[in-house]
Design a protein with these regions (language model features):
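Formylglycine-dependent sulfatase
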Residues: 2-3, 15-178
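C-terminal segment of classical bacterial N-terminal signal peptides
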Residues: 8, 12-16
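Bacterial N-terminal signal peptides that target proteins for export
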Residues: 1-9
């Protein structure tokens, strides 16, 4: 079974009604996923039929190496195409960070929007916790997910209970769940 990951189906860049000349794009980034953890990449002990089906229908990128092996930096590199240090995103942000990926950076979702795509990000953002650094201000039409990882919240087993709750956001507001 896959380790408990903060399954980051974030960066699912989607298009609802695609022009046949343009493909739909779904980009999946998962923290701490090893090459042997998904069936389509050779996992024998872990069954991942849904991911395997997606891989069969699309393009599998087999050689993405993160610029730094931490959440924030790898996301920044994927979104910008730049080394994390170039965009000021080395290391990992936490719940007290008041900086993040500068909204003036040119990002993949901004480029896709310029070409008429609708964009969305689902999962962990981890590129800035204040509203002006949020996913909607970085080129995503929709965002539903966490601003940072659960190891920066009171739900993490080794952290003090006085840590703030980890909010689930819809856009820039705390999600109302029924």
């Amino acid at each position: 079974m896959l380790r408990p990951l903060l399954c980051w189906l974030s960066l699912s860049v989607c298009l609802a009604f695609a022009d046949p000349a343009r493909p739909n794009i779904v980009l999946i980034l998962v923290d701490d996923l090893g090459t042997g953890d998904v069936g389509c990449f050779g996992a024998k002990d872990i069954r991942t039929p849904h991911l395997d089906a997606l891989a069969k229908q699309g393009t599998r990128f087999t050689d993405f190496y993160v610029a730094q092996a931490v959440c924030t930096a790898s996301r920044a590199a994927l979104l910008t195409g730049c080394y994390p240090n170039r965009v000021g995103m080395q290391g990992a942000l936490n719940h007290t960070s008041r900086f993040g990926l500068n909204p003036t950076e040119w990002t993949l979702p901004k480029m896709l929007k310029d070409r008429g795509y609708a964009t969305a990000c689902f999962g962990k953002w981890h590129l800035g916790t204040v509203p002006e650094l949020s996913a909607p201000r970085q080129g995503f039409d929709e965002f539903f997910g966490l601003p940072y990882s659960n190891d920066n919240s009171k739900y993490h087993p080794t952290l003090a209970p006085e840590m703030p709750p980890l909010p689930l956001l819809e856009g820039e507001k705390v999600a109302e769940l029924d």
